[in-house]
């Protein structure tokens, strides 16, 4: 019985992932660089045991150290586009990320936009992404903007883990290309997580969509490299 229960835990976590979001309070500590990690379930750490310690923002915090404060503003199953079924910009997490007055914003959205019910066109996606960037840049002072392509998505191991059967795996590459264009057109820094994870099924959990601990670590390292490059050039953090 215990073995059966243990075997069922990943599936239970996967099922709950799309429907629950635990809000953790974020206190802004003065005298530090403030980095807001904005996103959906990938940023939230969906399906990760002890997600608040193992998701990529937590790993990034350990990589950067005490000079910066990293806060995650993420809600499962949310879309970048306001025309999607669950827009991120209508969430309290978005308002909190603005109130946080970040020095740097790292955005990782787009996977949920791949669903047929949410997708309009690459042009519409790029336009609404530019609007999100503009909203953050309207803050004073304007933060540095880093945007990430969605990571690669894979088929689940079996039907019990297929909680994301409306995600269009074949559309994720198109969205990744759209994000690259957005970065170039809007002067944002880019982290290409799609290229980083392409062909690396071992970096994802049973559902094929959410990174496991190794995948979250790889994402954090990629973001850290971009932030460190900016720092070496005299930027933040």
Where in this protein do the model-derived segments appear?
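N-terminal secretory targeting modules
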Residues: 1-38, 42-51, 61-67, 99-100, ...
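General small-molecule cofactor/ligand-binding pocket signal
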Residues: 71-73, 146, 189-191
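A short helix->loop->beta-strand "cap" motif at the edges of active sites that frequently abuts
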Residues: 139-144
